Amino acid sequence: MSDLLANLNAPQLAAVTLPPQHALILAGAGSGKTRVLTTRIAWLISTGQVGPQGILAVTFTNKAAKEMQSRLAAMLPINTRGMWIGTFHGLCNRFLRAHYREAGLPAQFQILDAADQLAAIKRLLKNLNVDDQKFPPRELMHFINAHKEQGIRAAQAEAYDQFTSRRVAWYAEYEAQCQREGVVDFAELLLRSYELLQRNEPLCHHYQARFRHILVDEFQDTNRLQYAWLKLLAGRGGVPPEGGGACLFAVGDDDQSIYAFRGAEIGNMRDLQREFELANVIRLEQNYRSHGNILDAANSLIKQNRGRLGKNLWTEAGAGEPIRVFEAFSDIDEARFIVEEIGDLVRAGAPRDQMAVLYRSNAQSRVLEHQLFTLAVPYRVHGGLRFFDRQEVKHALAYLRLIANPDDDTAFARVVNFPTRGIGTRSIEALQEAARCANSSLYNAAASLAGKAGTSLARFVRLIEDLRSETRDLLLPEVIDRIIDRSGLRQHYLTDKEGQDRIENLDELINAATGFLREEGGASGDGDAMPDGGPLAAFLAHASLEAGEHQAGEGQEAVQLMTVHAAKGLEFDVVFISGLEQGLFPHENATLERDGLEEERRLM
């Protein structure tokens, strides 16, 4: 036990060893919050206050969840694979896989990532003869997701004008389309989980009794629905627990709330204090990441915000290098200065991959990239295409999804004529009309079309049926390999000018499946870690949930370019912040929005 608590500072120790009560831990940047969360879980288990299956730990990235599991495994002699540790989306996916019937879903329901959701909405609007120039699909997607994140279904949405009335109607059509095809988007994972718990009291009581301690990381980034889901499980959300409710241990920092544009509600932290009648608010203020000059500047800036819960970061690391300010004549002058400074640092022995150039908007990167390219400085832009977002990978995954669920129209539409099979736009439109009239999936409607289109479509349907039969007894990596060959994807990319890279990515998908089976195949836990659909359904869920969180590196030391949002939680030896001027950073919209300038300060 002494080893477990060794080297914690006094506030960290107080947080880790709190009695079983609700608590809010205000954790400043670099204050060791991950260590506190993980050690809290280990301490609760090692002192016998709760078993591993009585813990629900929520993170905001899969990377953070895996890090927590890894640290716990090193602290305690337990198998952490079966524990409920993950993101909101990952945990709700696991819950719905276990209770798909009660949730009104097929056993092998598929998850739409953001790109798939947008494609599904485009297809919907096209079927409804909606002008997508006048009504952009991306705006409708934002409208739908924003309502779901508030817990609002189409039937409950307020149509206060004709324009909104149309969007509400399309929202309802989208809900029906997803239900018919057996697919859910990210927001639906959480909303459907919440609704099921709310209406099924015995099931809610089961999970309330099971999870005695709920621990949440990055609480300041929760949206309204996520907070409602947590309250429900903790016994404060409309379904009273049969016994005592769970203890909610929330770790967050109101000064780091920078995702209002994604629906994050900074007010959730104040609501938590009021609704859970918190007696325990502990502040972690000692910073282990930065020097004093940086912290003094950050404290001075953030104290201008009103309504803060209050912290003042400090460090024992000394003052460090002073913050330098350079006033440029133009963006070109600024970029040239930054790149020349990088060159000087590299010549002095500083590694390029420990240098980051941050900007408020992606558009600012162009001039920086030009200067870096001109002076032959290797760089990497964070936010480029990620592995699971790459065209060839998404095509292969679409074939996998069709094998798992032939009613997945989004997957069908993606690959029915890829590689090219002579199925043109008119044939697809005729198929969509036939499916609409028959109220069936595109796959089931394909056989009803006659003529050349029908023959081509019939061959495609036969290919999918053959693949379903051929792969039934194969291991997951073998399934993917068979699909890549039989679908024609490998042959197609052999003739592509970027073919070698794309084929290597397809081979990497096979490797990813092998690694997934190795990591997850033994995750028996409490019996519900692997969904009823087996390894294929689990891997498809993994691909959607993980989509791009781990960007593939090129093995070359490079300067890192990214937005300030993308930089959250990362550390570099040298950081340049470009475009610190009115209209860029702070952003021009900051003065138009309530509390906009305060969010810009938090972002800085």
Q: How should these model regions be labeled?
A:
Residues 157-160, 351, 365-377, 390-392, ...:
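Conserved helicase C-terminal RecA-like lobe
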Residues 6-17, 21-26, 36-37, 49, ...:
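Conserved helicase NTPase motor core
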Residues 53-143, 154-159, 169, 326, ...:
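Conserved P-loop NTPase-based nucleic-acid remodeling module centered on helicase motor cores
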Residues 85-87, 188, 192-193, 557-564:
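Conserved two-lobed SF2 helicase motor
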Residues 21, 50-54, 79-82, 120, ...:
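Short glycine-/polar-rich loops that comprise or flank the Walker A/P-loop
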Residues 4-7, 33, 37, 43, ...:
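Conserved RecA-like helicase ATPase core segment
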Residues 4-8, 13-27, 53, 103-110, ...:
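Inter-lobe coupling/hinge region of RecA-like P-loop helicase motors
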